């Protein structure tokens, strides 16, 4: 259950980050997430991949920046591929950015992931891990069912509508 809580909590922080970034830049407050729950799973997956890096990487900030940014960018690339190929939608495109890979990732946002990796490993996760570990298993199973149901409903809606805007039309 521990890793589920990591995924869930960092997906929620990702949602807050997306909303804050959109507000700060004057962009659209689009949902790049799930239908009902305020979660951005790409952030949860990226955080989990960062946390799975070997311990010796954590002791070397430049290496953590590079490998953490790469690990989270892998999660972002795979999420974009899944959205495009399986669900028939696209939530983001970095087509106009230098060095982009099929519009799914680019060096600028990989660097942002690297900075997030540093904050995650050195500040956020050490403070939150003990709190998340204390959550009782039955609570975890309830949340797991809710997230799975929302993920399924979101995927079905996106596949049927073929438009990410469908998540906003509730």
Model-identified regions with their sequence ranges:
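Aromatic-rich, lipid-facing transmembrane alpha helices and their immediate juxtamembrane interface loops
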Residues: 1-170
């Amino acid at each position: 259950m521990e890793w589920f809580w990591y995924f869930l909590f960092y997906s929620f922080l990702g949602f807050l980050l997306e909303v804050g970034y959109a507000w700060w830049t004057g962009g659209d407050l689009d949902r790049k997430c799930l239908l009902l729950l305020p979660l951005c799973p790409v952030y949860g997956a990226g955080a989990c991949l960062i946390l799975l890096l070997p311990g010796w990487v954590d002791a070397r900030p430049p290496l953590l920046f590079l490998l953490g940014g790469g690990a989270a960018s892998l999660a972002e690339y795979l999420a974009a591929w899944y959205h495009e190929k399986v669900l028939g939608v696209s939530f983001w495109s970095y087509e106009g950015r230098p060095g982009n890979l099929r519009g799914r990732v680019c060096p600028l946002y990989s660097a942002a992931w690297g900075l997030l990796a540093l904050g995650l490993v050195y500040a956020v996760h050490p403070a939150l891990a003990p709190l998340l570990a204390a959550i009782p298993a039955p609570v975890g199973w309830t949340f797991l069912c809710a997230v799975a149901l929302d993920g399924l409903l979101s995927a079905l809606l996106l596949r049927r509508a073929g438009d990410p805007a469908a998540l906003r039309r509730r």
